[in-house]
C-alpha cells in the first residue's frame, strides 16, 4: 500500500490549526511520483518504489497505465500530464516512451523563464499548457511565469478532474447535485472512542453515448461526508483516516437507514501545498536532496551537478453548490450477504445529519476503494486559502 494519503495528515493538521479549509489528492500525488520514478535510479528509485508500495518500476508503470485507461474511458474524468523541458536537455527515448504509454505524458521543449537584470523572472516567455486527454475541449491555460526559477530544467505538470456528475435529458448534458444521485445513505460509527456520522452520496456515470451506465463496468464514485459528534473531533478523525488501513472505505454506510433532516452547507474553495517537505518527513527525501537525488534515467545529457526535485506543489479545488446542500432522505444500500435470502433486517431509527461544525469529506471510487480526494471544511464561507 502506498503512503500518499499520509501527506494529508501533515498538511491537513496544519490547516486545522490555522482554521483553514483543506483538500488534497493522493491520486494526483501518486501519478506525479510514478512518472518521476520512471526517470530515477539507485537509492532514489528504491525510496520511491517503497513509498508507492511497488516492488518494481514495471509494476508501478502497469498500475499507472491501468488507471489512465479507466480515466480515458469516461467523459466525466479528465487526466492531464505534461513534461516541460529546457532546450539544454534531451530526454532519454525510453523515458519519453514510458511517460507517454504508461502515464499519458507528453512533453515540450521550451525556453524556461530566465531572471532579468533585477533578478525577477523574465515575462517574455509565453504560457505553456499541455494536456493528454481522451477528447478535446476548451481548457484554461496555466502559465509557468512566476513559478519557475532560472535554474530549473524540467517541469512536470499533472492535472486530474472529476467534474460534477451529469445526466442526459434529451436537451444536452446538465450538471446535477446529490439530489440526482443514484442513492444516498448514512450511518453512525464509533471508532477508538470517537463517534462520528457518515453520509454517502453515489453519483450517476454517463457513457459517451450520453446514457446512464448502470453496468458493472462503470466506475462507482461517491462523496463521503464525515461529521464528528464532538465539535473538536476533526483532528482525531483526520488522523484515523490517514493512519488506519482503509479507514475511509471501511466507514462506508452499509445498513438501510433514513437520514432526516440531512443538511450539508454549500462550499467552494481551493488549497495548495508543497508536498516536498511532507514527503521528506515520511521517508521520501532522496528526490529532493541535491546531493542524493539520482534522476539519471530522465535525460541523455544530465548536468554534471545532476537533477533533483526542488519543489513539488499541489493545488486542488472543490465545489458543492446550492443544488447539493440538502438531501431529503437517504436511499438504501444493497442487502448484506450475511443475511439469509428473503430475510430483511430491521430498519434502524432515522438519523439526523446536520453539518453545522467542521467536518471531513472524501471523494472515492467505491468499487476499487480508491480515495481520489480527501479534505475538510472549517468554514464554508471561505473560498480560497
UniProtKB/Swiss-Prot annotation:
Q: Which GO terms describe its molecular function?
A: serine-type endopeptidase inhibitor activity
The record's Gene3D superfamilies line, in alphabetical order, gives:
Alpha-1-antitrypsin, domain 1 (2.30.39.10), Antithrombin, subunit I, domain 2 (3.30.497.10)
Q: Gene Ontology terms, cellular component aspect? A: extracellular space
Q: Site: Reactive bond. Where?
A: 338-339
InterPro entries associated with the record: Serpin_dom, Serpin_fam, Serpin_sf, Serpin_sf_1, Serpin_sf_2
Cross-referenced SUPFAM superfamilies, in alphabetical order? Serpins (SSF56574)
Top-rank taxon = Eukaryota
Q: Where is this region: RCL?
A: 324-348
What residue range is the signal peptide? none
- What Pfam families does the entry give? Serpin
User: Family per UniProt?
Assistant: Belongs to the serpin family.
UniProt remark on domains:
The reactive center loop (RCL) extends out from the body of the protein and directs binding to the target protease. The protease cleaves the serpin at the reactive site within the RCL, establishing a covalent linkage between the carboxyl group of the serpin reactive site and the serine hydroxyl of the protease. The resulting inactive serpin-protease complex is highly stable.
Q: What is this protein called?
A: Putative non-inhibitory serpin-Z11
Traced from the root, the source organism's taxonomic lineage reads:
Eukaryota, Viridiplantae, Streptophyta, Embryophyta, Tracheophyta
